[in-house]
């Protein structure tokens, strides 16, 4: 009998912390399903979701201000456990009758917390056997008075109330961040809350997820036929294998060669499927359609929507050649949904639309199938391992659905795409040659439509700029720019400027996510 992977769930209310997605990943790593919503999500929706526990994230607001973000009051009437982290702890304290104030000493970075009094959350958890925890702090406000019914459970030298609890109601607050790796016992603390206090069963496992996804696809598609928009990346490949298991020959994959692919990528994708996948794949050449559609468009959001519409038009054209195509499948994953602020997520602010979420037309002729829509990237990769997808495909760097269309800043021209393809190929070639490809999670080149002065021999040149980007990340929700060796960057830069006639300058992107996104557009 299949376990219900959604039976026990945790609701995470996001107050804007850069660590909120880490909370979600930690909960799922424990083996429990969770969903992330903005803090001001509709109260009726919360009741309908029926979570077994709620986590209030940190956030950048100053909780003592009149207009500070507050948790929906309904959560305190549901008789379920609540864990407030950092800002979440502060707003919980104020909303339940306590007080917060500016801290005498702000705490940013490592701190030592002393566990105090007995509580189901922290008892018998320590790093040094003396009730001390090495934790990560990030706050300038602190709780100064506990609400009625609460007791102190943790403190630091600079923060008297670093943790509190109302054990009877199962309400807990932590001023530190258990979700970050810097808090050594963070995973144990979260597991104590989720498994012990919320009493969630660990049904969110890779095997259970696969079984549920395949069954859902069978139920949803029935005897109809389905198209899969194939990119060659791990997300769409996982969807392809799941669909093959669910509906077999009812699946047709369409690989759109749109002129915005990496060097030789079209041939490589077709070769991957010929060698590893026993399924029908159609290659649609749509260079002209995409370039014509993008002509004279500079705005990133508009480009994404144009590309989304063009993909759908190609799928519709191919569907007319086949019988009974009622469904279109895509490899949309949870970060795509979060960043696009899908309508399901209420009042979340748009970061950027993804061509397969916010970029789809309203008059879509297919029923949309997105089996990975609830999954983070690392969860998709775990599934791909279980499905025996070859490792060189699983760990291939991600490539955005809009392709080079969002790596060429501003207007997309075929000339720009050809230059960028060459630069990106040189970057990838050297990453492989120097055994650096697998040390970063994503790397690529970006074309900047600006010209910079350079020198070739004794002659002045005035040509375009290429930016190189490489990041280290687990879930692609947060990322650290990769510290590639200077000698390596020097080698790549020289090759690009010597081998591509229209490039006079190469720069390296040293922006993390946040505040930047991984892609430039």
Curated annotation (Swiss-Prot):
CDD domains: GATase1_GMP_Synthase, GMP_synthase_C. ATP binds at residues 231-237. Its EC number is 6.3.5.2. Coiled coil: none annotated. It comes from the Bacteria. InterPro entries: Class_I_gatase-like, GATASE, GMP_synth_C, GMP_synth_GATase, GMP_synthase, GMPS_ATP_PPase_dom, NAD/GMP_synthase, Rossmann-like_a/b/a_fold. The active site is at 86 (nucleophile), 177, 179. Pathway: Purine metabolism; GMP biosynthesis; GMP from XMP (L-Gln route): step 1/1. Residues 9-203 form the Glutamine amidotransferase type-1 domain. GO terms for cellular component: cytosol. Residues 204-396 form the GMPS ATP-PPase domain. It is an enzyme of class 6 (ligase). One of its GO terms (molecular function) is GMP synthase activity. Keywords: ATP-binding, Glutamine amidotransferase, GMP biosynthesis, Ligase, Nucleotide-binding, Purine biosynthesis. It catalyses: XMP + L-glutamine + ATP + H2O = GMP + L-glutamate + AMP + diphosphate + 2 H(+). Catalyzes the synthesis of GMP from XMP. Homodimer. HAMAP family: GMP_synthase. This is GMP synthase [glutamine-hydrolyzing].
């Amino acid at each position: 009998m299949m376990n219900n992977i959604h039976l026990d769930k945790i609701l995470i209310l996001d107050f804007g912390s850069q660590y909120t997605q880490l909370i979600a990943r930690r909960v799922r790593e424990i083996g429990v399903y969770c969903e992330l919503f903005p803090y001001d999500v509709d109260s009726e929706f919360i009741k309908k979701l029926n979570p077994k526990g709620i986590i209030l994230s940190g956030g950048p607001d100053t909780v003592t201000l009149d207009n500070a973000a507050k948790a929906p009051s309904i959560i305190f009437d549901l008789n379920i456990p609540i864990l407030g982290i950092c800002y979440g702890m502060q707003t919980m304290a104020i909303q339940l009758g306590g007080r917060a104030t500016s801290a005498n000493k702000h705490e940013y970075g490592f701190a030592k917390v002393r566990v105090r009094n007995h509580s189901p959350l922290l008892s018998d958890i320590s790093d040094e056997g003396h009730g001390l925890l090495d934790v990560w702090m990030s706050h300038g406000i602190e709780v100064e008075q506990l609400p009625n019914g609460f007791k102190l459970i943790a403190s630091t030298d600079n923060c008297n109330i670093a943790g509190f609890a109302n054990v009877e109601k199962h309400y807990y607050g932590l001023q530190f961040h258990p979700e970050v790796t810097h808090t050594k016992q963070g995973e144990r603390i979260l597991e104590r809350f989720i498994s012990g206090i919320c009493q969630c069963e660990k049904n969110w496992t890779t095997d259970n997820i696969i079984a549920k996804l395949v069954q859902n696809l069978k139920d949803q598609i029935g005897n109809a036929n389905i198209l899969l928009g194939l990119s060659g990346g791990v997300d769409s490949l996982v969807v392809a294998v799941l669909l093959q298991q669910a509906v077999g020959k009812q699946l047709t994959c369409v690989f759109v060669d749109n002129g915005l692919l990496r060097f030789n990528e079209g041939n490589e994708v077709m070769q991957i499927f010929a060698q590893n996948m026993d399924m029908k794949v159609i290659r649609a050449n749509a260079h002209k359609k995409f370039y014509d559609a993008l002509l004279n468009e500079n705005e990133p959001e508009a480009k994404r929507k144009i590309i989304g519409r063009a993909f759908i038009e190609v799928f519709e054209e191919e569907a007319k050649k086949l019988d009974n195509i009622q469904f279109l499948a895509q490899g949309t994953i949870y970060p795509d949904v979060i960043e696009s602020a899908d309508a399901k997520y209420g009042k979340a602010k748009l970061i950027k639309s993804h061509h397969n979420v916010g970029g789809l037309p309203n008059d879509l002729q297919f029923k949309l199938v997105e089996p990975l829509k609830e999954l983070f990237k690392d969860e998709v990769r775990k599934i791909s391992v279980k499905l025996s997808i070859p490792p060189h495909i699983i760990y291939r760097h991600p490539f955005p659905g809009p392709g080079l269309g969002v790596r060429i800043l501003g207007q997309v021209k075929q000339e720009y795409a050809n230059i960028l393809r060459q630069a990106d190929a040189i970057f990838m070639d050297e990453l492989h040659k120097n055994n650096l490809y697998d040390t970063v999670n994503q790397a690529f080149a970006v074309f900047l439509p600006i010209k910079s002065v350079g020198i070739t021999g004794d002659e002045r040149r005035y040509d375009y700029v290429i930016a190189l980007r490489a990041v280290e990340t687990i879930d692609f929700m947060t990322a650290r720019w990769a510290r590639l060796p200077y000698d390596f960057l020097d080698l790549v830069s020289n090759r690009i400027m010597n081998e591509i006639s229209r490039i006079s300058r190469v720069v390296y992107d040293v922006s993390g996510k946040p505040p930047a996104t991984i892609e430039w557009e």
